[in-house]
Amino acid sequence: MPVINTHQNIAAFLDMLAVSEGTANHPLTKNRGYDVIVTGLDGKPEIFTDYSDHPFAHGRPAKVFNRRGEKSTASGRYQQLYLFWPHYRKQLALPDFSPLSQDRLAIQLIRERGALDDIRAGRIERAISRCRNIWASLPGAGYGQREHSLEKLVTVWRTAGGVPA
């Protein structure tokens, strides 16, 4: 469960994202995925313990994650990229990269995709479709990374307490 107190369907959607992004069941996580750093091409899982800022905020090099040399700074339960962190940290007045800040940022990204009302109303398939350009693991994202099936994610969402329309 996310740490933020929010609508049941939104909490379930956040849990679904964590499963989809591979952080909820990450082999090293000590904090429900909030401490996960993207796994690079070397395949070595990694976590962080300092929540004062995004793990890539102070010059840490991005991790190469495929043979094409593409790099990522994805971190935390929702694999949030450092590229967008300074903007949202300021916009949302986030004091740190704590679990609560990560939840608030994820909800803001969902809001910007116009999916919050769909999630609240239980229109999960539509919400997933609206958010697929944010999270590479969602079906139809098209980032060339592993995508989960819509059926699997709907099942995860329902198991996490999501109530369909």
From Swiss-Prot:
The keyword Transferase does not apply. The gene is K. The active site is at E21. It is found in: Host cytoplasm. Belongs to the glycosyl hydrolase 24 family. GO terms for biological process: defense response to bacterium; peptidoglycan catabolic process; viral release from host cell by cytolysis. It is an enzyme of class 4 (lyase). Keywords: Antimicrobial, Bacteriolytic enzyme, Cytolysis, Host cell lysis by virus, Host cytoplasm, Lyase, Viral release from host cell. It comes from the Viruses. Monomer. One of its GO terms (molecular function) is lysozyme activity. Endolysin with transglycosylase activity that degrades host peptidoglycans and participates with the holin and spanin proteins in the sequential events which lead to the programmed host cell lysis releasing the mature viral particles. Once the holin has permeabilized the host cell membrane, the endolysin can reach the periplasm and break down the peptidoglycan layer. One of its GO terms (cellular component) is host cell cytoplasm. It catalyses: Endolytic cleavage of the (1->4)-beta-glycosidic linkage between N-acetylmuramic acid (MurNAc) and N-acetylglucosamine (GlcNAc) residues in peptidoglycan with concomitant formation of a 1,6-anhydrobond in the MurNAc residue. This is Endolysin.
